[in-house]
Amino acid sequence: MKPEDLFFDTSGLDKDHAQRLTEEALTGSDDGELFMEHTLSESFSFDNNRLRAANFDTSRGFGLRAVNDETAGYAHSTDMSETAIKRAASALTPVISGHSGTVSDAPAKTDTSLYTDTNPLEGEGFADKVKILEDILSL
């Protein structure tokens, strides 16, 4: 699966349309970006060494950031749609217009790669994961 398939398969958007919306939203700003995120999570709950609950969740969304002089604004949504991106762009209008609020120091920049493209949730089957956790609990 290509990364763009994670965001554009059901959103009614494609990569080029999202890029055009982002360019329109950031017109007049010094810098900015559209950040998209897709998250998979899995959890297991044991009680008295017995599996009591197992959960799996998938979520996705985006953040739109605009920088103008020393002011940055950020808007986000879990709805990956044209309407949501336009709504986020509207929330950034004061920053792009030169108005400011609370200023935060930028985080320290790093170029350290923290993650690989390997999905650990696909590595082992459900039964194998439960067995590993049961073995750990029996120690």
What are these regions (language model features)?
Residues 1-139:
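Active-site bordering "gate/hinge" segments
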